Amino acid sequence: DECASAWAQGGIAAVLDPQDSVDAHVNDTMIAGAGINNLQAVREILSQAPAAIAWLLEQGVEFDRLEDGQTLHLTREGGHSHRRIAHVKDRTGLAVHQALLHACRARANIRMHESHAAVDLLHAHASSANTCFGAWVREPDGRVTPWLAGHTVLATGGLGQLFSRSTNPWTATGDGIAMAARAGCAVQDMEFVQFHPTALQINGQAAGLITEALRGEGAWLKLPNGERFMPRHDERAELAPRDIVSRAIHAEMQR
């Protein structure tokens, strides 16, 4: 469970309220991305979000519901103009992570190899294109062996641990990105590393994330003297996107 997915708290954004729209969701996302997002990709992903929530429900994710027991409870997070965040209390990522692990283990056609680590891709440089046919894998006994595959998918998370201070888990070391780059794949937008704006550290322990949904429900960010500071950094105040909130917090700490 030491991965960013399991750490995620707030929820998953999808247009599930009749008063909301995919166009509004797309607009919010493009603004939060400073307009450099791929509009086609944004629209395609967000259009499929409601179906993705329905599929997660089928896999056993128990999203919070209203008192009627049917309607999903939706909260709001930074950068969103509507309530569209489906959630499982304040541990949505862990709930999704565990439900999908359970679903994978229940399928006879999926084999899971724990305590193994891919260390590099098996690939051949051809005149027309690079060809990947698997990966070098470190076995539990330390041996590195070739695993052949007709199709190889890299889904290994980010590289937040490149920074000395990070709200990413210790596993976010960029191994998959490095393997892809060494194999000749193009990497893009590597400068965009997310720092969660709010965390709590007690007595030197590892900092725990404070869910963004708190700000979505009206919580304010204040300085040690009790002064609220976000309104002077952005008109959306605590509901500004994460990058703006993170920079504002850093700026206040440097004053």
Where do the PLM segments sit?
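Generic structural signal for well-ordered, non-membrane alpha-helical segments
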Residues: S5, V22, N38-I53, K89-H97, ...
